[in-house]
């Protein structure tokens, strides 16, 4: 893939194996902010575009761990199942673990580090948002995407859902992704980049490490939905029901790929 300053972060994240790890290392938002060009993202982060380009080239030529599945080519049903089994499972598991860690660390260190209460409050808001968010995806949006794909494969009409068009829940999910991204940035700021203070105990260190890992996982989770699943679902529905889309108006592709 051609790597240049004018290519969007989204296209680099989906087209280059290992690109998401590079973006994580440089602090580049590739999930909710994937619509920006590489040049714009570097300017916002205060980074030389040459450094990021070089790292992306190295990542693209390096052997990649894992399954190596190209989710741009796999079925949408397989992708939704992967998201649920891998990311939703991990998110629920870690939210409970992080809540317990916050309780423990706040009880021991809040006197010297009152900012912990702000971090805990932000985390609770994130948890309260993510739990129903994942349920809506699992119970409403993802099943419809599966039914839509089955109808497309069998060349039959797509059943009209109660939400009229897949674009409506997609917009809602992406708005909620934006909120989650904002809360993660607040958490990172309050904790000074998930840094353990000199007087922090092992539990404090574990909390900071777990928050950093949770952030990276949620970034990739949202990337798969915002930049691959949702655009493909919208495109499939549009291709299967072009007359409906003509009357409904254009879908804002840039909004689908991030703010």
Language-model regions, residue ranges each:
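Small-residue-biased structural context
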Residues: 1-259
């Amino acid at each position: 893939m051609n790597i240049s300053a004018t290519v969007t972060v989204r296209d680099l994240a989906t087209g280059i194996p290992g690109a998401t790890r590079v973006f994580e290392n440089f602090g580049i938002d590739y999930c909710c902010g994937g619509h920006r060009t590489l040049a714009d993202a570097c300017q916002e982060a205060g980074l030389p575009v040459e450094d990021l380009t070089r790292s992306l080239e190295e990542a693209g030529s390096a052997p990649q761990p894992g399954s190596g599945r190209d989710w741009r080519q796999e079925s949408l049903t397989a992708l939704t199942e992967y998201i649920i089994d891998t990311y939703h499972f991990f998110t629920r598991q870690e939210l409970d673990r992080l809540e317990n860690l916050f309780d423990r660390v706040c009880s021991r260190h809040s006197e010297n580090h009152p900012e912990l209460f702000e971090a805990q409050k932000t985390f609770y808001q994130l948890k309260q948002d993510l739990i129903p968010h994942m349920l809506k995806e699992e119970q409403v949006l993802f099943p419809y995407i599966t039914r839509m794909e089955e109808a497309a494969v069998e060349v039959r009409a797509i059943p009209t859902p109660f939400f009229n068009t897949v674009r409506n829940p997609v917009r809602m999910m992406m708005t909620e992704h934006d909120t989650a991204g904002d809360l993660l940035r607040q958490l990172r700021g309050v904790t000074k980049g998930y840094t353990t203070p000199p007087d922090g105990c092992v539990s404090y260190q574990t909390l900071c490490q777990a928050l950093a890992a949770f952030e990276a996982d949620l970034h990739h989770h949202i990337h798969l939905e915002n930049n691959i699943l949702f655009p493909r679902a919208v495109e499939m529905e549009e291709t299967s029901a072009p007359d409906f889309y003509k009357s409904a108006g254009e879908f804002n592709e840039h909004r689908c790929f991030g703010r």
